[in-house]
């Protein structure tokens, strides 16, 4: 058995799989069982009770940021392009960027577009859609208010959504962060998810919550949000 495998098993053995941990205890335990040197990301997995017609999708700005700055690409023309440039977008353009992306360029993390550009940007659907980067009004990435869009993205606004199995996977901290700040991010995220409860849903909305670190085992969370 590899040294890495032994360390994982040792960490795994410290987690009681039959127990529901408070978020405070779970965060402390993740740090206690950490066995790698790099700064691990802390992730959450929420299993929701959803019907086929239900959609859970939104964006959030966590109170305590931890991710590296995103490279923001904005499709805009004229005054809108000047506005995007003034507020710090990384790349701004129209047909030139569309052609560049078609040629295989992909050095960007978020895509924003003004409404008048969407007809042209739509040609990039197969490319941007595969990366989950297609601009969408629901995620506030199709807008004429570039100031607010860019500023919120620079602050870390991130999309979350439930997959076809009703599971939301999301990163909300780093192991190097103060426990209280990790918990604050957790609380804010859960609060935003609960707001997306479908109005016609009967019974519990959240079935289960687990958190884990990049290399560590998952820990089941005790929760009261329904």
From Swiss-Prot:
GO cellular component terms, semicolon-separated: large ribosomal subunit
GO process annotations (BP): regulation of translation; translation
Domain of life where this protein originates: Bacteria
CDD domains named among the record's database cross-references: Ribosomal_L1
GO terms for MF: rRNA binding; structural constituent of ribosome; tRNA binding
UniProt keyword annotations, A-Z: Repressor, Ribonucleoprotein, Ribosomal protein, RNA-binding, rRNA-binding, Translation regulation, tRNA-binding
One Pfam family of this chain: Ribosomal_L1
PANTHER family reported in the protein's UniProt record: 54S RIBOSOMAL PROTEIN L1, MITOCHONDRIAL, LARGE RIBOSOMAL SUBUNIT PROTEIN UL1M
Function according to Swiss-Prot or TrEMBL: Binds directly to 23S rRNA. The L1 stalk is quite mobile in the ribosome, and is involved in E site tRNA release.
Xref: HAMAP family: Ribosomal_uL1_B
Quaternary assembly: Part of the 50S ribosomal subunit.
UniProt family annotation: Belongs to the universal ribosomal protein uL1 family.
Name used for this protein in its record: Large ribosomal subunit protein uL1
Species of the source: Borrelia garinii subsp. bavariensis (strain ATCC BAA-2496 / DSM 23469 / PBi) (Borreliella bavariensis)
UniProt gene name: rplA
């Amino acid at each position: 058995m590899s040294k890495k495998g032994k360390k994982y098993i040792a960490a795994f053995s410290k987690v009681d799989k039959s127990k529901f941990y408070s978020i405070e205890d779970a965060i402390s335990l993740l740090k206690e069982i950490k066995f790698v040197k790099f700064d691990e990301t802390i992730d959450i997995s929420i299993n929701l009770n959803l019907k086929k017609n239900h959609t859970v999708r939104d964006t959030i700005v966590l109170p305590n940021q931890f991710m590296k700055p995103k490279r923001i690409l904005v499709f805009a023309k004229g005054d809108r392009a000047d506005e995007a440039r003034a507020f710090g977008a990384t790349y701004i353009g129209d047909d030139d960027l569309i052609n560049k992306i078609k040629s295989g360029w992909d050095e960007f993390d978020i895509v924003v577009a003004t409404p008048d550009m969407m007809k042209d940007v739509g040609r990039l659907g197969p490319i941007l859609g595969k990366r989950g980067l297609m601009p969408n009004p629901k995620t506030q990435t199709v807008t004429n208010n570039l100031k607010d869009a860019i500023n919120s993205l620079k602050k870390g606004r991130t999309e979350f959504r439930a997959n076809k199995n009703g599971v939301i996977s999301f990163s909300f901290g780093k192991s190097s962060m103060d426990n209280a700040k990790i918990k604050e991010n957790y609380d804010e995220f859960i609060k935003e998810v609960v707001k997306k409860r479908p109005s016609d849903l009967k019974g519990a909305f959240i079935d289960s919550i687990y958190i884990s670190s990049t290399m560590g085992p998952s820990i089941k969370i005790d929760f009261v949000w329904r």
